[in-house]
Amino acid sequence: MNPILYTVHGSHLYGLAHEHSDRDTYRVVLCDDKRYISHMIDDVSDSTEIHFDRFVGQVNKGVPQALEALYSRSAVHNTAYLPYLRSLRPDPYTVADTYWRTALNFAVGDFKQKRHAMRLVLNLFDFMRDGIFDPELRPAEVAFVNRYARLDAQAFHVELQSFLEYALRGVI
């Protein structure tokens, strides 16, 4: 397999890891099977490996995990593919739709899921403004997602809806 992109992923990428967090990784490869995807989990790690073409398809669909890997400052790239990776520009409306649905799905969950919903809102806001985002949260952003994730379900849903609408102002 020919590696194209490798990055830490999940809580270690977002800056939300704690002492018991597993180590998530995301790797994009070239291999014979264009449908290839592998997801392996054990006690200490969670690794995703995906064919380059399938990865590009996920980027174009606005899949959060693919966009986070694409925009990760921690990523190691095969330099031959770096210009192409940097040229990828998913459709903002597609990204907005995917992030909206995903954030609302997370909204009904526990603290960790609500934190992910708020993180997606921050990423969506930056993406809609700049066409790119940094999945690595700053300390103030970590405090922001943690504060809102502590709200009860009803208050959280109201706040999330408001932040989503703000992120998409001028689009919806």
Language model: regions and residue ranges:
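The feature captures the alpha-helical scaffold/lid subdomain characteristic of nucleotidyltransferase
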Residues: 1-19, 32-172
